[in-house]
Amino acid sequence: MKVAVLGAAGGIGQALALLLKTQLPSGSDLSLYDIAPVTPGVAVDLSHIPTAVNIKGFSGEDATPALKGADIVLISAGVARKPGMDRSDLFNVNAGIVRNLVEQIARTCPKALIGIITNPVNTTVAIAAEVLKKAGVYDKNKLFGITTLDTIRSNTFVAELKGKQPQDIEVPVIGGHSGVTILPLLSQIPGISFTEQEVIDLTKRIQNAGTEVVEAKAGGGSATLSMGQAAARFGLSLVRALQGESNVVECSYVEGDGKYARFFAQPILLGKDGVAERKDIGKLSAFEQQALENMLDVLHKDIELGEQFVK
């Protein structure tokens, strides 16, 4: 099993690489790539951790050596948010970075599962899909926008509010991965109920949690450590599914039946070929139904921006 992390020298990439080095199955290969010259050193640093995960680092313009033979590619390359920016302000820089890296994936490991972390995810996933399509290698079951951070934040905030253990809570989060497009389905958590005001406040906090971190870091960065953890959780779920484990379910931003939008975050069953099944989002509360309808314009525009960028 070979996993490649692109953007491995950044805050998210290093946290993700550390978690993968300690948690990937024995005998796995972990390949780190970043344009930054420090990347081979990050790999050497991590290689001193005593786990049976083989690690190599590559830097420079060419990601090909890192991508050769990869089963899973996780992309965290790009610039981070600063105070006053929202995820869409990142588009101008990150769109080009994602296009370039996905072109290299299309040439080098076209059958790999691809997980996109680089923001704005609503748009960068659409860019990746169009690049793969142009190259004639697009498989909609193998491209994922990683929205797991919304899930783990939801689990944490609900547990805090209700005095529960966070590991016992799993909140499905649908829609997209920015602002109003993030919709936690709080009505679907077994055995937990909320007042109307709690739902409004929690939903808003989950939607704005990224900004909470950006502001708390006072210009020194965005959510890197929690995002690294979220990406590792999703990446390890992909590994387990590829190894034939059954019933691996995660929420992710994927191309589906287009009922709400071409790309939509929803619970998915993972299998040996990526998405095995897109699960129904279930019954929504009136609040959730309204929130879903309200987000679709924004989501459609985000997706179109990505499609137009490649065309």
UniProtKB/Swiss-Prot annotation:
PANTHER family: MALATE AND LACTATE DEHYDROGENASE (PTHR11540), MALATE DEHYDROGENASE, MITOCHONDRIAL (PTHR11540:SF16). It comes from Yersinia enterocolitica serotype O:8 / biotype 1B (strain NCTC 13174 / 8081). Its EC number is 1.1.1.37. One of its GO terms (cellular component) is cytoplasm. This is Malate dehydrogenase. Pfam families: Ldh_1_C (PF02866), Ldh_1_N (PF00056). The active site is at 177 (proton acceptor). The keyword Chloroplast does not apply. GO terms for molecular function: L-malate dehydrogenase (NAD+) activity. The gene is mdh.
